[in-house]
A protein has these predicted regions:
Chain A
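Short secondary-structure junctions
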Residues: 11-20, 61-65
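Short, non-transmembrane amphipathic alpha-helical segments
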Residues: 7, 11, 50-59
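A short interface-forming secondary-structure element
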Residues: 34-48
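Short, surface-exposed ligand-recognition loops at beta-strand->loop->(often short) alpha-helix junctions
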Residues: 1-2
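Solvent-exposed beta-strand sheet faces enriched in polar/charged residues
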Residues: 23, 36-38, 71-73
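Histidine-centered active-site/metal-ligand motif
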Residues: 32, 51, 66
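Short edge beta-strands and adjacent turn/loop segments
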Residues: 17-34
Length: 87, 158
């Protein structure tokens, strides 16, 4: 079983993180996760490149999961996202 | 010559108990594994080039077996991808495909979408491209769907 703490540690070790949300979408079973990562490491990368990058960072963990989804934003995109939510 | 090679690999496989662990990565077995992957690789390559839109999913469009696969099918449906331009593969029906498509695409999850032979992404990417309009652009540019008709007035004409 993978814990959210494992995922967080792996992500933080790989890239600078502005904001991070990790959700166990398997109701506590540790099998399905959704992550939301905001990092300047994503600057200049299109969505596919960002997702492949995170797939690589979490390669071992994802291989053990039943499902994995991710949302990746740069700091600037995150600010825009927050502004839209506040509106 | 062929028979000798066959006998050798059979011998390697037949007596695993007497074979030390290091021999499990012997050249013969490693070659066998690579060979299977190459054939599967060629099959997938051909599949993604044969039809403009190819979706590897769990279940079928009429009976998806997973929420992510269902979402992917629905999104493509919303964009009106015609049946003859799309093909889906059910990885639950083919366990070799289920594993080999992950190696082929270097992508760990299902569903996986290919457009004109190029990997586009999984469900997350598809949904965000749908929301941003990027998916529509891609499908139009790839000749899968016609560009949107300019808005016409609803006056009837004789």
């Amino acid at each position: 079983m993978i814990s959210a703490a494992d995922l967080e540690a792996a992500i933080r070790a790989a890239i600078p993180v502005i904001h991070l949300e990790i959700e166990d979408t398997s109701n506590g079973c540790g099998e399905n996760y959704a992550v939301f990562v905001v990092s300047e490491a994503f600057e200049g990368k299109n969505t596919l490149a960002r997702h492949r990058f995170i797939n690589e960072v979490l390669k071992g963990q994802i291989a053990q999961m039943h499902a994995f989804s991710q949302k990746t934003l740069t700091p600037a995109q995150y600010q825009a996202h927050l502004a839209k939510q506040a509106a | 010559m062929f028979r000798t090679a066959l006998r050798t690999s059979f011998t390697a496989l037949r007596a695993p108990a007497r074979v030390p662990a290091t021999a499990l990565v012997s050249p013969q077995l490693a070659f066998t594994r690579r060979y299977i992957t190459q054939e599967a690789r060629a099959k997938i390559q051909q599949a993604v080039e044969s039809t403009p839109v190819v979706l590897f999913m769990k279940g079928t469009p009429d009976a998806p077996q997973c929420g992510f696969s269902r979402a992917a099918v629905q999104v493509l449906g919303i964009h009106g991808v015609p049946e003859e331009k799309m093909k889906t593969f059910d990885v639950l029906e083919d366990s070799e495909l289920r594993q080999s498509i992950k190696e082929f695409s270097d992508w760990p999850t299902i569903p996986q979408l290919y457009v004109n032979g190029e990997f586009v992404g999984g469900c997350d990417i598809l949904l965000s491209m749908h929301q941003s309009g990027e998916l529509d652009d891609l499908l139009v540019k790839s000749g899968v769907i016609p560009p949107e008709e300019p808005e016409t007035t609803t006056q009837t004409q004789n």
